[in-house]
């Protein structure tokens, strides 16, 4: 699949006349709890030609390339990324922390060096807490629950605890967050759910787990 993804990135550069400085995996594969039928959520950052940024009519700062059952590929202009970084947007930090990197350049390495200067504990904490609360309220109150929704609530909750405890951006990998922040009494149940999630289809449901 890596070769397929790299080939698609090359097509993007040629068709859009841009330079991609990094491409990573986001979503469940990068978090470490993908299902057998999970798609590939590829995200990239790109730079346009200098003259493109001087056009009076402006130009889109997002490229949406492919969305199907296998590949979900889209990217942001570096200008957009820097604007969001200035606001301490958590998505930028997550992209830059992904454990699955398909492609990167020296420009991306330089970008990563300045990340800590823009991290806001308050903004990031609110982001993850709100995400966890929303998933709990909308998806975890029924008697049957889609397995992945447990992790879409647990991961941001643990990320919020990480931020409170360490005052730095949380890691992408769910296992790292579990090791550092999960209450030991919940570990067996979470490990059981994680094993099920990794071996069952993406949309699989199960009885509500009341301990979580």
Predicted segment positions?
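Catalytic metal-binding acidic patch
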Residues: 27-68
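Short loop/turn segments at secondary-structure transitions that flank enzyme active sites
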Residues: 48-51, 88-91, 134, 159-160
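Conserved nucleotidyltransferase catalytic core and NTase-mimicking acidic/glycine-rich helix/loop elements
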Residues: 112-212
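A basic- and aromatic-enriched beta-loop-alpha substructure that forms the phosphate/nucleotide-
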Residues: 55-131
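Helical scaffold of the NTase/Pol beta-like nucleotidyltransferase catalytic core
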Residues: 1-24
